[in-house]
Each structure stands twice: as C-alpha cells, then as structure tokens.
Amino acid sequence: MTKITNDLFLKAARKEQVDRIPVWYMRQAGRSQPEYRKLKEKYSLFEITHQPEICAYVTKLPVDQYGVDAAILYKDIMTPLPGMGVDVEIKSGIGPVIHNPIRSFQDVEKLTMFKPEIEVPYVLDTIKLLADDMLDVPLIGFAGAPFTLASYMIEGGPSKNYHQTKSFMYREPEVWAILMEKLGRMTANYLIAQINAGTSAVQLFDSWVGALSRADYAEYIRPVIEMIVREVKAVHPTTPIIMQAVGASHLLAEWETMPLDVVGVDWRETITSARKKVPTKAIQGNLDPSTLLAPEKCLKEANRILQEGVLEPGYIFNLGHGVFPEVPPEMLKKLTNYIHERSEILLKKDDIK
C-alpha cells in the first residue's frame, strides 16, 4: 500500500492538532473537469465506474489538479442497489430512475442479499488500485444512507417532497423496518468491504434525511444508522466515519450520541453553532457551493468560515453540498490554495496547533 504522506485529513477527523486546515470537496471528481467531460464523450457513467483504471484516474484528478488533502472514490450512491435486485438507471438530466419501485411488502421481500465481493468487485478493485499505487492522501469511501436510498426506491426517482416515502414509512412501519434492516445490512457490508480494500475513511451520504422531523428520525431512522456504525466500528474501530446530510441541522443532537467521528454541516449552520451541538465530533463543511460561481464572495465566505474553523482542533473544510458542473476547475484550485495558506496564518496567529 502506498504510504500516506499527507495525513492532515485523518488528523482533523481524529480532532488532533494540525498546522493547516485540510480541504476536500464533495463531487470534486468529475462533472466540472474538462478531462472528465472528454471521457464522458466516449464512456457512460456506468462504463467509467465499472473500469477500475479509468475510475481511479477520475478519482485522482482533483488531488493532482487542486491539491486537496483527500480523495473520494468516484461512483454513485446507487452503485450497490442492482446487487439487491433493484432495476436502476441513471438518466442524464434527471438522475437515478428506479424501474421496479417499492410499493408493498412483497417488493421489499424480493430484495436480495448483497455481497460486495460478488456484486461490485470493480469498486473494490478501484480502491485497491488507488490505495496500493496511486495516492499519498487518504481515500474516502462512501455509501448512500438507508433513508436516501429508500426515498429513491419508493418514489421511483428524485423527489422534492418525499410524500410517497414518508407516507409508506407512516402507513407500513413494520415493512419500513424490514426495508431499513435490508438496506442497513447492505450498507454496513459495503462500507466494511471498502475499508478492507484500502479506504482510510468512509462517509454516509443521507442527502434527503433533512425532510424528516427529529422525532421521526429518532423513531424510523436512528436504529438503522446506529446498526451500520456499530457493525463498521466492530471491524474497523479506528476508521473515521463521516455523516453528511443537507438541511439537517435539527438532527445534529442525534448524531452527537452516536459513535460517529465527523459530522458534515451545510451553510444553514455555522461551524461555531455546530460545535456546540456535537462537541465530541469533528466538523466538516460548510461553504455554499453557489459561491464558487462568485469568486470574490467565495473567498470572503471561506475566510469567515476559517475564522471559526481554526478555533478548535477537529475541522475539515468542505462544501455544504456537491460541486456544480458549471464551476471552473481553476476556482477550486484557487480556493484550495487559499484555504491552505490562510488557515496556516490563522493557526499560527491563534497558536492553535
């Protein structure tokens, strides 16, 4: 395995002292990069993610181009679902479309056992290739969290209100629990397999869970998240686990009492406020990605965020959501350099090391 010479991200995830703030970006690989767009002229998303050499190249591009302190595996949260019998298609301009949506207990019962080594060997081969030969920064693996996956599976695709998902959850609580159990087991096995293959950390993306109240989260979702984290930690107790959601600040107190290591927040929550709600966790975030299209505002906001981030150990600079396709790659490089240089000055000034 290639030696990790830049471990700033891992130190921050463990709330250790650093000399500068680590930075990486959700969706840093892919859509905004001309090299990726050129690949997409020849290959589909399916073809890219199923060819380890190409997928590893795409994953590594931001490390080489922007100088970020971590790589995140290039793939989709839908990747494992076909291994459970879900007929999913990624449609351009729409997103994931499920051709056999969940409507009943019988549909949930049909979901099959997921074995990563059998169903997604190309994912594990990509990780091994990156970890063994290509990266000197940590590699982050990830999975979609059960609520977000279930919302696609029940709605049949993207949704603005998740009415079908929530009504199914309320109307069929026992069937919902079975669905969560199946998705939870799949997610735990998937994350464990990624760590076994060489990832240094893993992130749970629960993109749409902010649609739930805290009470509903505690009743319908928390048990499965606890199970996932518990099972991963039982095998890999020192591997950082990140929880990332959007519009979910009201759930921070739930995550504080779980054995998570890092909590991602978006621009609706300040770093200072988040720290008060999750004092034992490292914080990741929280620049609004829209500012990347307004350079002056972007750097101003980045400085404001850093002023809060450097006050305590355990901070990782990121966005509150993913990079837009319209973002110029040079802006991400400029921002990365700014974060590194500015945070080093601030840390020396405040003598926080």
UniProtKB/Swiss-Prot annotation:
Pathway the protein contributes to: Porphyrin-containing compound metabolism; protoporphyrin-IX biosynthesis; coproporphyrinogen-III from 5-aminolevulinate: step 4/4
GO biological process: protoporphyrinogen IX biosynthetic process
Positions of substrate binding: 27-31, 46, 76, 152, 207, 321
Compartments, as annotated in UniProt: Cytoplasm
GO molecular function terms listed in the Swiss-Prot or TrEMBL record: uroporphyrinogen decarboxylase activity
Keyword Ubl conjugation: no
Keyword Cytoplasm assigned: yes
Domain of life: Bacteria
CDD domains recorded: URO-D (cd00717)
Enzyme class: lyase
Family: Belongs to the uroporphyrinogen decarboxylase family.
Protein name, entry field: Uroporphyrinogen decarboxylase
Record gene name: hemE
